[in-house]
Amino acid sequence: IILSKITSLSLVMAISQLIVLLFYIISALVLKVPFANYLLDFLLWSITGWIATITIVTIQIFLSIRLKNFAVPILISAILAIAGLMTLFIGQGLFSIFPYAQIAVGDRARSLVPFTLSEFILFLVVNGAYIFVFYTLAVRQLKKRFI
């Protein structure tokens, strides 16, 4: 059940990222801004932003199962998203590993240059770890509830 929710929401988020990329291309064409040199970067940033949304989806599914509520996990998400913005002022190290800042990290919102290899590996490891941990916690919580 949990994996199907994550998969379906991830598909919706992938479509959303593709729409944003399409709007970028259309706006660049309309405004006659050269974009061909940066298209691969924007495609990669869309993919890494999508990976980061899977992290948030997994955390939110865990919170929804754990709290048995709809509104409270959304409130927690809003608070943690604001906290993610606050990590910008605390330091780059915390910003790069805070779960609710991962979309900004993946979309390269802070620096419009491609990932270095070490940044890319850190991004994949951090997001993979969050997805694994919160998926495992969600499955465990669901099993505990029904067993």
Task: Set out the residue ranges of the language-model regions.
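Secretory targeting signals
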Residues: 3-67, 107-113, 117-120
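Functionally important transmembrane alpha-helices
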Residues: 55-86
